[in-house]
Amino acid sequence: MHSSTLTPSDLGTFVRRVRKAQGLRQDQLAGVAGVGLLFIVDLEAGKPTIQVGKLLTVLEALGCKVAITPPTGTEEAP
């Protein structure tokens, strides 16, 4: 599954779909990722103020990779 997430809501929907595809409940994902259940609930609801570090931990627990692509015509940072 590939997705270009543009909003917190898009990201929440993406995480929910991947979680359900893996047969996990929200509490199970929270346990595997080492975050609280409320964080998963807020993430999947599209809360715009979630913590990026925890988000990355959840994505890693789901086996997802994050790629950031610089705008065309710009140099990549070293």
Residue ranges and their predicted role:
Residues M1-D10:
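A detector for short, charged/polar N-terminal pre-domain segments
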Residues E60, A67-P78:
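Short, charged recognition helix plus adjacent turn
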Residues K47-L59:
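Short, basic-rich loop-to-helix N-cap that marks the start of a DNA-contacting helix
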Residues T13-V32, T57:
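Short basic helix-loop element that most often maps to the first helix and adjoining turn
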Residues Q26, E44, E60:
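Acidic-residue sensor for enzyme active/binding pockets
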Residues G34-P48:
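Recognition helix of helix-turn-helix/homeodomain-like DNA-binding domains
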